[in-house]
């Protein structure tokens, strides 16, 4: 494939691009003319629509709404879902601690403890802002985290007692727990 073939292919692609943009502009203009020809939107009309038309319009508007959903909006929504997702029983304890900490900070803000307070900040020699922690807020946060940790520990102990003393950390369900126990037995056999 020589340079001439590549140039010819490039010209063809450019022509297709121009044709597509012209078609797109024509279609957009015809849609605009059709919208203007309809006059007022149906929302302002006092005429009652048949139920089938209204339902069809609802599904069509829902489809248009989904088509106009941007990737950035989805990523923001996904991040929000990840932040609010509660870890499962077998979750990593580091994730659980992080989730608890974030949740308690959020609760402090919601209760208005932090809202409206003057910050005790100063600017260091390097030009960075240094904020001094307020002892009462630190104490409240520590107490809330300890209370949550104690409650979760008690729940785990109750669950372990209910299961007959078997460890449930890291098990998603009974079948998974049985599999993990079988793996443990195999590792002990091979280790001896």
Curated annotation (Swiss-Prot):
Sequence similarity: Belongs to the SYF2 family.
Function (record text): Involved in pre-mRNA splicing.
Quaternary structure and interacting proteins, as annotated: Associated with the spliceosome.
Region (Disordered): 16-62, 76-108, 148-192
Listed Basic and acidic residues bias regions: 18-41, 152-165, 174-192
Extent of Acidic residues compositional bias: 49-60
An example Gene Ontology biological process: mRNA splicing, via spliceosome
Designated name of the protein: Pre-mRNA-splicing factor SYF2
A cellular component term, taken from the record's GO annotations: U2-type post-mRNA release spliceosomal complex
Main location: nucleus
Cellular localization per UniProt: Nucleus
Keywords: mRNA processing, mRNA splicing, Nucleus, Spliceosome
